[in-house]
Amino acid sequence: MDADDSRAPKGSLRKFLEHLSGAGKAIGVLTSGGDAQGMNAAVRAVVRMGIYVGAKVYFIYEGYQGMVDGGSNIAEADWESVSSILQVGGTIIGSARCQAFRTREGRLKAACNLLQRGITNLCVIGGDGSLTGANLFRKEWSGLLEELARNGQIDKEAVQKYAYLNVVGMVGSIDNDFCGTDMTIGTDSALHRIIEVVDAIMTTAQSHQRTFVLEVMGRHCGYLALVSALACGADWVFLPESPPEEGWEEQMCVKLSENRARKKRLNIIIVAEGAIDTQNKPITSEKIKELVVTQLGYDTRVTILGHVQRGGTPSAFDRILASRMGVEAVIALLEATPDTPACVVSLNGNHAVRLPLMECVQMTQDVQKAMDERRFQDAVRLRGRSFAGNLNTYKRLAIKLPDDQIPKTNCNVAVINVGAPAAGMNAAVRSAVRVGIADGHRMLAIYDGFDGFAKGQIKEIGWTDVGGWTGQGGSILGTKRVLPGKYLEEIATQMRTHSINALLIIGGFEAYLGLLELSAAREKHEEFCVPMVMVPATVSNNVPGSDFSIGADTALNTITDTCDRIKQSASGTKRRVFIIETMGGYCGYLANMGGLAAGADAAYIFEEPFDIRDLQSNVEHLTEKMKTTIQRGLVLRNESCSENYTTDFIYQLYSEEGKGVFDCRKNVLGHMQQGGAPSPFDRNFGTKISARAMEWITAKLKEARGRGKKFTTDDSICVLGISKRNVIFQPVAELKKQTDFEHRIPKEQWWLKLRPLMKILAKYKASYDVSDSGQLEHVQPWSV
């Protein structure tokens, strides 16, 4: 079962990465520039994938400085040397700024040190400066070799043998300031740190009715400031790419006082450290504080987050991203020829792609140039689709126009939560309500799912009613698993009574089934002939039509955090294996991705049937592992992966078979996976996807205006989801064919392609399908 079969032409040969296919190669891995959480996950993936394909992998300590100094700074890595680093922030191989490498003499020394170990493949994890340096090194390589030969430091054979240097980059930077990739390694973790601080500050600010000015990192890039402002519903944000208009001081003070007048007890202003005005003059946090104090007299505090943002444990997203990129980097090095340019492994949507390194660097420099020349619209455009989308969404949600400036549509749009609670649902409701009001609709909230709908628990909901909802976990509207099927008459009556013109459903598989039932009931009940759209929100991530659902990232972080703690407990005890049961129904997403993020030895899932022989081989594998220095094991099991191989059965089997070698413990994570404050990813995903759903509803209602049109076509009842690189609306009627209704999962799931990754990184042999990687793409500037 492969989610990407469609990409390989029918009848084409699938391409697999074979074990030991890189024998004889030597790869050097280094981290350079400012550190970022997740760099260790990338180093681990490069080392283990390199060893798996039979290459020698060398650590280059302290970045380019270590390459120039040589000696013990370049050391061969083995499997165990990258154990227990997945959950550690920063970089275990060190990073340093290096002046020597900027000179030709320095690069000559570096080339000599690499040649002594036969290293002609470099994997560089760092920012644009580090990657530019690597590219220059690659260009000069043949000249450096000739110079070394002239100096008698190497012989002519070596010049022939090591004629080419291959370079692959991964972007490790918390600022997300590199063009060509949606997310850089470390950005998501930095957002976690910022949001933890904002959530903590909110409670104290509310107690004292204070205004807080938070300064976040980003000298030349406002990504962290923008996304954290979106994730916490900040009152105002200052970015280098989009400076405030002339007279912003007065506008900001008006906005803050309006919010106070609406009984909001706190104001949050987020400032990127590189914030500027339209004349390129810096806007500092102190300047903003003075302004608020003198103009409004509010009790105002400044908090500068500083290096806290670089620290702490990497988030699940960063671990998975870095692991995928590390593996892709090794494949890119194996496939590199003298003609391929240095490339960067990056993320586009949900897809790992390779881009020419210098194209990305050039575009990144173009952004800075545009800002220097005060071409701010160009700067936003060059930052890419994701940045521009975030900025647009923030503006729509933060600033409410006066009522007399909003054209009224006389349409009522209802929002409902269905299924089990998922973190991020409230962010989605807030976004829908505010976008709907800004579009001129009257917004209605339906409480307690379809059950509440049938009973008429429906109330109008206003702009300020949803203030502060973004960071709240669970479902404030209330949610139930009840399907509408048995209440169709009552729901139709409520639709008529409240004259509901469109419906937005936020929920999991029950929401999807409910949408199908409402669709089927259109013939009988004309009340259901209105635009309906569903936004997937469930920890299980099992809704057809979308690669991701709201809540899954928060659950994944909960699982990963718990696994980290459990691994620590196992390390202290020595020779202990933990069996952990995750949620997800029949969908193995949480078990599989949790396994990848936590560094598990195995993950049992329903989608990949297993038998007693597989369990036996896992036990043998763990028995071998206990002979090494890593004397602990971690096994994840999806709650419904097998009727008979239950968590208890697997625990008992492992306990018996491991007697005398290791002991075993089990842990069922349960409902803690549904709770907690939403992660930054879920807050923003919920906010953005829900805003898109409302835009679709508005467009549909516009089509029908004045004609009292009934919506009966399939394309008026859709699921909105992310698929590969696009946000798409898919009619539920079409999704039926793609659904396994018995097990409540889509028939094809993209993440199954990452199954072999987890196995390879846990020292199993597995064939990894690389059919759709390897094409070098080009950076496309995005047009606003």
Swiss-Prot record:
Subcellular location(s) of the protein: Cytoplasm
Residues of this chain annotated as glycosylated in UniProt: S540
C-terminal regulatory PFK domain 2, as annotated region: 412-784
TM ranges: none
Record-annotated active site: D175
Extra information: In human PFK exists as a system of 3 types of subunits, PFKM (muscle), PFKL (liver) and PFKP (platelet) isoenzymes.
Protein family (similarity comment): Belongs to the phosphofructokinase type A (PFKA) family. ATP-dependent PFK group I subfamily. Eukaryotic two domain clade 'E' sub-subfamily.
Protein name, as recorded: ATP-dependent 6-phosphofructokinase, platelet type
Organism per entry: Homo sapiens (Human)
